[in-house]
């Protein structure tokens, strides 16, 4: 009996040895979480500040089929860091940009970088992400580190409702100063299940970065609203920090309300260098030109929109709008806009009340009519306003 006793004693030890080492991080969504919003980011919180590597893969799999649903290749740079040189062939489009669409293209059904308008395809030299149906795509950071937290940004619209997923992260994608993190394998079982179905109504949508609302991101809520809806939708953004690139087009009758200027902040590190206009097409000289991609928050070809009680900011300098508006009957109440050059681009009919605006030269750019009431505007040098209003358009009124 003694040999049998020894064998039985050894089996638990061998089983323990086969278990993967703990990932040494707090995970969000938590392992085994249910009712997760499909627009969730993947978040790892460590005890020390992680370093993002320049190689390795992040993959997310469907649990049932074990097929890869999305992947991020860290060997691809996030985006340009130096300005482009444009040739004489770069000019404004001679035909109006076409905003019509029968459905919103996503990364699931369209190759990021697919050209629209008169643009050429966006080269795949950098990370590309279709946001808000803009198929030409945006450069983006697949991982952003703040203090000891690493947030992974999947390509938009890749996860679905009523599905289970698991995540793997190659060793070297993230490292810690003490080298105690070696990635996450399938055996670590970082898995979660999304909500069974979409929100029952578009009347009111709650955005909460902690996953307690209908969506985790502002973009997720905007994508859910049908184009040119005749029914009003209220998006309530809970207090928190929302680091995301926001682009919406063809949205109407939407109220976007935060919890206060000092409590709800939507921001991203974007500018003309990181997301430049196409090599052969200029942007924003007159209505109908190719849309700009350089702002942190963009409402394009939108009307009857109200923004209230939040801060919108870009985290970069240069030609860098915090907020870019292109549409009619857009109102801002108690909104703090922070940008650099062209901090606010206002095209169309815009009303501002009790707002704050901080920027650099050309603090306000656009083809307004902009009417500002009881609002404060500050810049750190250079022209305050560069209005390119056309005949019959009165420009900006303060």
Locations of the language-model features?
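Positively charged n-region of N-terminal signal peptides that target proteins for export
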Residues: 1-4
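Sec-dependent N-terminal signal peptides
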Residues: 6-8
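C-terminal motif of bacterial Sec signal peptides marking the signal peptidase cleavage site
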Residues: 13-16
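Acidic, low-complexity Ser/Thr/Gly/Pro-rich repeat segments typical of extracellular/periplasmic
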Residues: 20-199
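Sequence-level preference for short, compositionally simple segments enriched
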Residues: 195-212, 216-398
């Amino acid at each position: 009996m003694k040999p049998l006793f020894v064998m039985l004693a050894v089996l638990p030890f061998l089983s323990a040895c086969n278990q993967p080492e703990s990932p040494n991080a707090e995970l969000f969504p938590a392992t085994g979480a249910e009712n997760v919003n499909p627009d969730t980011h993947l978040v790892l919180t460590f005890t020390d500040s992680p370093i993002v590597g320049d190689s390795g893969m992040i993959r997310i799999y469907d649990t049932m089929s074990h097929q890869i649903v999305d992947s991020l290749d860290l060997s691809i740079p996030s985006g340009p860091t130096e300005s482009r040189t444009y040739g004489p062939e770069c000019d404004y489009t001679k035909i109006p940009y076409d905003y019509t669409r029968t459905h919103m293209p996503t990364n699931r059904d369209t190759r990021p970088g697919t050209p629209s308008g008169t643009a050429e395809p966006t080269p795949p030299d950098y990370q590309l992400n279709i946001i808000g149906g803009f198929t030409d795509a945006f450069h983006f950071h697949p991982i952003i580190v703040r203090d000891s937290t690493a947030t992974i940004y999947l390509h938009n619209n890749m996860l679905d409702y009523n599905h289970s997923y698991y995540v793997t992260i190659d060793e070297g994608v993230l490292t810690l100063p003490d080298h105690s993190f070696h990635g996450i394998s399938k055996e670590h079982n970082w898995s979660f299940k999304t909500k069974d179905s979409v929100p029952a109504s578009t009347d009111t949508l709650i955005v909460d970065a902690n996953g307690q609302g209908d969506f985790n991101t502002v973009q997720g809520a905007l994508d859910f609203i049908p184009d040119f809806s005749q029914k009003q939708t209220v998006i309530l953004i809970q207090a928190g920090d929302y680091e995301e690139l926001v682009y919406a087009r063809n949205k109407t009758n939407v109220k976007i309300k935060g919890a206060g200027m000092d409590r709800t902040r939507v921001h991203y590190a974007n500018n003309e260098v990181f997301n430049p206009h196409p090599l052969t097409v200029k942007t924003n000289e007159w209505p109908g030109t190719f849309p700009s991609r350089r702002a942190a928050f963009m409402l394009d070809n939108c009307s009857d929109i109200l923004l209230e009680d939040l801060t919108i900011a870009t985290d970069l300098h240069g030609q860098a709008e915090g907020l870019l508006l292109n549409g009619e009957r857009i109102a801002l109440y108690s909104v703090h806009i922070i940008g650099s050059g062209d901090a606010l681009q206002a095209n169309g009919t815009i009303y501002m009340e009790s707002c704050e605006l901080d920027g650099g030269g050309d603090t306000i750019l656009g083809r307004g009519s902009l009417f500002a009431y009881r609002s404060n505007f500050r810049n750190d040098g250079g022209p305050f306003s560069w209005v390119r209003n056309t005949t019959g358009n009165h420009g900006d009124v303060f």
